[in-house]
Amino acid sequence: MTSNNPNQPVSYPIFTVRWLSVHALAVPTVFFIGAISAMQFIQR
């Protein structure tokens, strides 16, 4: 984060495992929060 080198191959491929783990948790979480909040309005 503090390094200003765009060609830093130390931990650069974060879109392989970290991207999958973040989106595998974030996408269903946003979907379930939207679905649960929608159920709160259609129930009454």
From Swiss-Prot:
Residues that hold heme according to the record: 23
Keyword Cell wall biogenesis/degradation: no
Keywords assigned by UniProt, alphabetized: Electron transport, Heme, Iron, Membrane, Metal-binding, Photosynthesis, Photosystem II, Thylakoid, Transmembrane, Transmembrane helix, Transport
Membrane topology: Single-pass membrane protein
Tagged with keyword Thylakoid: yes
Family annotation (NCBIfam families): cyt_b559_beta
HAMAP family: PSII_PsbF
Protein name: Cytochrome b559 subunit beta
